[in-house]
């Protein structure tokens, strides 16, 4: 899987792909603070979408990830043939989810993915597994949140 992905992305992203594949299962654990944030955003009427570089297996095991239940739409790379941060991945995501980049706020753990989204008109921030920082970034972007 790693070789197949790395053939289609810049070499500067190879290490990130290798780390992602190694840690993928660990990152699928429930994340109560993230679930609380997603629930709060849904209560306020925000539409939430997942854009993920992942395999077909995601659909099967995503039922066990509570955060996925908050999503209005899910885009996974294996179903379209593009990977973040490829421009075509974002264009396909916008089209399939019927969203405008300028109306979106993108959160991702890869700076390259955020930069690609920004180039196409999105606003966003890199998520460093730091919930207070993420909440601060969302507030600074004009997204109202409760105090945590």
Q: PLM ranges: what are they?
A:
Residues 2-6, 20-25, 58, 62:
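Hydrophobic alpha-helical core bundles mediating ligand binding, dimerization, or RNAP-core interactions
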Residues 6-7, 94:
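Residue-level preference for well-ordered alpha-helical positions
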Residues 8-49, 87:
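Short, acidic loop-to-helix structural element flanking the phosphoryl-transfer center
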Residues 39, 55-148:
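Asp-based, Mg2+/Mn2+-dependent phosphohydrolase catalytic module
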């Amino acid at each position: 899987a790693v070789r197949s992905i790395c053939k289609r992305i810049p070499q500067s992203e190879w290490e990130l792909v290798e780390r992602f594949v190694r840690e993928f299962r660990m990152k699928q654990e429930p994340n109560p603070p993230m679930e609380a944030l997603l629930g709060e955003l849904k209560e306020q009427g925000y539409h939430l979408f997942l854009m993920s570089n992942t395999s077909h297996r995601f659909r099967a095991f995503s039922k066990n990830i509570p955060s996925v239940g908050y999503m209005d739409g899910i885009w996974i790379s294996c179903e379209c043939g593009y990977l973040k941060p490829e421009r075509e991945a974002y264009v396909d995501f916008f089209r399939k989810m019927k969203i405008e980049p300028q109306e979106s706020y993108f959160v991702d753990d890869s700076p390259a993915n955020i930069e690609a989204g920004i180039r196409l008109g999105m606003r966003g921030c890199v998520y460093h597994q730091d919930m207070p920082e993420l909440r601060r970034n969302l507030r600074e972007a004009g997204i109202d949140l409760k105090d945590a």
